[in-house]
Amino acid sequence: MPRTDDDSWEITESVGATALGVAAARAAETESENPLISDPFARVFLDAAGDGMWNWFAAPNLPAQIAEAEPDLKPRMQGMVDYMAARTAFFDNFFLAATHAGVRQVVILAAGLDSRAWRLPFEDGTTVYELDQPRVLEFKATTLAEHGARPTCHLVSVPVDLRHDWPAALRQAGFDAHAPSAWSAEGLLPFLPAAAQQLLFERVQTLAAPGSRIAVEAPGPDFIDEAARERQRQTMQRVRDLMADLEPDRDIPDVQDLWYFEEREDVGDWLGRHGWDVTVTPAPELMARYDRRPPHDIEDAIPQTRFVAAQRTERTRPDR
């Protein structure tokens, strides 16, 4: 279903369902022979959400009819598991390095089913602010509480739509804009229109004191490439048609319907112009760093993203 300006969602629908797909990839990596990351809560979320296409990433085998008709699908899905593992490790290491360096405020934008507040060994005195749709945060908190999970930090949930006045909600929740903070935008930007992305970083700029850090998964220059999008859409449509024959009542959403394919400013360039020291790593390079590689013989096997890490150095004080 196409996006609207004020749409909202449960965890099993629309944008929420994509968080389950990511959790399934983390579960698959966690349960693999040589896992790069460990997320013991990913499987908990999947079990709580019930059956859905998101479980394909965490299942050992695809339905035989689909595997035979689409032989590239299994290696393509493994490529995405490897991509998600490298992505997760990148953000894990970013937050641990920031808190080890003395940052005690962590802000996770569009937190989804991110479980870092429960699984990372944050330094004493760290506060983690999670921002997302109210029903998504409620599902996560309820599910983890039912399994006896306890945060490893001071956790503050901020139920707010990032298209609304989230800076005010963050401040009201106790965030101190005059102390350094560490921010993440993981799996977020494609779901925002270009203007909303611009506003997001302008707002972060007003809240991030000198010494703050930010990590971003950013669309690469080929994000709006029409040919690549069409290839991906055709592959997805074939899978949907096959799945409709197997399970007529199950709809498989196309993530492209949830993304905004618009020209947008390069994140690294924007941060660099606004007083941040920036490092940009293309996705294949990041995966290689963690000894993971996309399938070499499958086109468009992983998102052509860039991973941006930056630290604010200029001395302009944030807005009051």
Swiss-Prot record:
Residues 294-320 are annotated as: Disordered. One of its GO terms (biological process) is methylation. This is Putative S-adenosyl-L-methionine-dependent methyltransferase MAP_4078. Belongs to the UPF0677 family. Keywords: Methyltransferase, S-adenosyl-L-methionine, Transferase. S-adenosyl-L-methionine binds at residues 132, 161-162. InterPro entries: Ppm1/Ppm2/Tcmp, SAM-dependent_MTases_sf, SAM_mthyl_Trfase_ML2640-like. Exhibits S-adenosyl-L-methionine-dependent methyltransferase activity. It holds the Pfam family LCM. It is an enzyme of class 2 (transferase). Its EC number is 2.1.1.-. It comes from the Bacteria. One of its GO terms (molecular function) is methyltransferase activity.
